[in-house]
Amino acid sequence: MARLTESEARRQQQQLLQPRPSPVGSSGPEPPGGQPDGMKDLDAIKLFVGQIPRHLDEKDLKPLFEQFGRIYELTVLKDPYTGMHKGCAFLTYCARDSAIKAQTALHEQKTLPGMARPIQVKPADSESRGGRDRKLFVGMLNKQQSEEDVLRLFQPFGVIDECTVLRGPDGSSKGCAFVKFSSHTEAQAAIHALHGSQTMPGASSSLVVKFADTDKERTLRRMQQMVGQLGILTPSLTLPFSPYSAYAQALMQQQTTVLSTSGSYLSPGVAFSPCHIQQIGAVSLNGLPATPIAPASGLHSPPLLGTTAVPGLVAPITNGFAGVVPFPGGHPALETVYANGLVPYPAQSPTVAETLHPAFSGVQQYTAMYPTAAITPIAHSVPQPPPLLQQQQREGPEGCNLFIYHLPQEFGDTELTQMFLPFGNIISSKVFMDRATNQSKCFGFVSFDNPASAQAAIQAMNGFQIGMKRLKVQLKRPKDPGHPY
């Protein structure tokens, strides 16, 4: 009864302070309880309504929604330039309970005539953000505790708007609940006072009280967990999850570019690949050293390139076919990777075997054996990580740009980047938004800097299920002037 009294007090206070508006769709039958016309609760919810036919306006939609309570405001969204119907609307009820009833009864439950997908009825983005920092997740409860027991536990910290104990299909408690306060300050006070403060009878650990995750955060966490599992099972997805992934990938690309432009032939095995790195000795689960190797000769060596980490190096095959020469005592697996399975032949020059070793302790000699342009860039690439891209590119090279469809409507550019970042270096990411409604169109683009990352993302994320939808991830079609349609 205390909750009802506080709710009525808030409502009466608002009736005295708030002017009487006359918005679109404010008229309707008087609901039980005698709510005055045009007044709304302080905690009323603004709903976003999507997937409505474009020929329906406010007066056509009112009969559908006013069965759940008095409508404070109903506005069909239209293009500000053309005036055309956008197929969506904003809806606010006078009473908060009416909005909850409408969402429960209609969201993805009813398909309006002429539409292929069911109607969307959910809190607008502004409402979701506002409730995020006052809704708490409570774990490690006694499974015998009811909503009333949880209310008694949290009521000393403020006004509670909602309290729900999570239950299984058989009605038994799962030992956790959601509690929503009327303000962030009250929720924060409850966390500080109750989190870890006691252990409930029958619980395995102390009470857990924290801010509840949003749907967006839960979806992202589930995606990251799935990608992490794929990284363990699929070697090609292992490298991007290591601490040195961005640095190692950029270094590989830089070295490959330097050697390919120097006039020398580079064996394909010399370029590191995720599956080859795992063959090198003294590595961790992800194929990389557990800790960075100390720099040698004043150089900041990358994790895989130190004088102690590379027992043997193979000289590149020059235009004169000088030969592939392994160092004595080199690691067999490393020599296999570098030689790419080739049988080593004696070098024509006695100094070829020592040519590349100074690159890791200071290039000071044997410079006449190779062109200066071939050695100097390598020496500069070892001490420091490659610089970031100087300019933000809108698209990556061909084969590196992905089209993603069926994104959750709550996802923005940041969430899209977080979703695909584990697969490699992202040049740009963009979720397309409706300018009139500021709502996501549920599709976007992600551009990587190499095709391998794009293919890994397609392999892992295409068909990933989110709610009732599955992500569609595919290569963006290249621009072809000859086929504009």
Swiss-Prot record:
Pfam family, one: RRM_1
Gene Ontology molecular function, alphabetical: mRNA binding; pre-mRNA binding
Region (Disordered): 1-40
Subcellular localization, as worded in the UniProt entry: Nucleus; Cytoplasm
Tissue expression from the record: Expressed in brain.
Name by which UniProt lists this protein: CUGBP Elav-like family member 5
Family, as annotated: Belongs to the CELF/BRUNOL family.
Start and end residues of each RRM domain: 45-126, 134-214, 400-478
Any GO BP annotation: mRNA splice site recognition
Function statement: RNA-binding protein implicated in the regulation of pre-mRNA alternative splicing. Mediates exon inclusion and/or exclusion in pre-mRNA that are subject to tissue-specific and developmentally regulated alternative splicing. Specifically activates exon 5 inclusion of cardiac isoforms of TNNT2 during heart remodeling at the juvenile to adult transition. Binds to muscle-specific splicing enhancer (MSE) intronic sites flanking the alternative exon 5 of TNNT2 pre-mRNA.
Keywords, sorted A to Z: Cytoplasm, mRNA processing, Nucleus, Repeat, RNA-binding
Domain of life where this protein originates: Eukaryota
Primary subcellular site in the record, as a coarse category: nucleus
Regions of compositional bias (Low complexity) in chain numbering: 12-28
DNA-binding is among the record's keywords: no
InterPro entries listed in its UniProt record: CELF3/4/5/6_RRM1 (IPR034648), Nucleotide-bd_a/b_plait_sf (IPR012677), RBD_domain_sf (IPR035979), RRM_dom (IPR000504)
Biased composition regions of type Basic and acidic residues, renumbered to the chain: 1-11
GO cellular component, one term: ribonucleoprotein complex
